[in-house]
């Protein structure tokens, strides 16, 4: 029996991947001024970054409940099981809404095996979890096997973020404006990580060379079994820096694969252009 996968735009995977693998797509929402857009459908990250550089502050919101319901109903009618791997509940209300809507849909289709997972992951870390699930689907695993494996995979995923300009986090209320101002003067680059699905500060590094060196150190401390690992790199209007980071990772660890994708407008709305994020499995 076919197991259908569903994910949302916060995976930072290209739409072409969703189409190629037949994965249901749920877009988060982004607002600029009084206009609302669907992430990766009616707006893209480069448009968001241009607006941010012009002083605008985009806002994000969870996926539309009706959109979620429409996607769930689409799979309910097939009679096959479906698994929605959701963006971290610590960063969006989409998971909670999806659980509520899944219960409504299952009342209408009581035999429909629909499951919703809180990935507690973000950006391409979340994307790596979806890729892992897609591989399991191709291998013919049951929905129970896929759900168990994905939960375990997500619990082992490291997310290390850094932003180029603290101003954007300050605009969104993530840090104080004073911290952003002082950080900019001193060329301070913050490192952040995910803890229980939330983005939290890790360290502050002065200068890009030291920053990259520290990221490699953290990967050495936390990662393992690199020859069997796919490492993810997300970037925001800074592909050159992401490529430099990729070369350092290749030289230090020689992982099985490194994938790079631009950050989506939903994630980028908070972190801003210049964001760089690394994802890998911990020991």
UniProtKB/Swiss-Prot annotation:
PANTHER family: DEGV DOMAIN-CONTAINING PROTEIN DR_1986-RELATED, DEGV DOMAIN-CONTAINING PROTEIN YITS. Hexadecanoate binds at residues 60, 92. May bind long-chain fatty acids, such as palmitate, and may play a role in lipid transport or fatty acid metabolism. This is DegV domain-containing protein YitS. Residues 3-282 form the DegV domain. GO terms for molecular function: lipid binding. A fatty acid binds at residues 60, 92. Gene3D superfamilies: 3.30.1180.10, 3.40.50.10170. It comes from Bacillus subtilis (strain 168). Pfam families: DegV. Keywords: Lipid-binding. The gene is yitS.
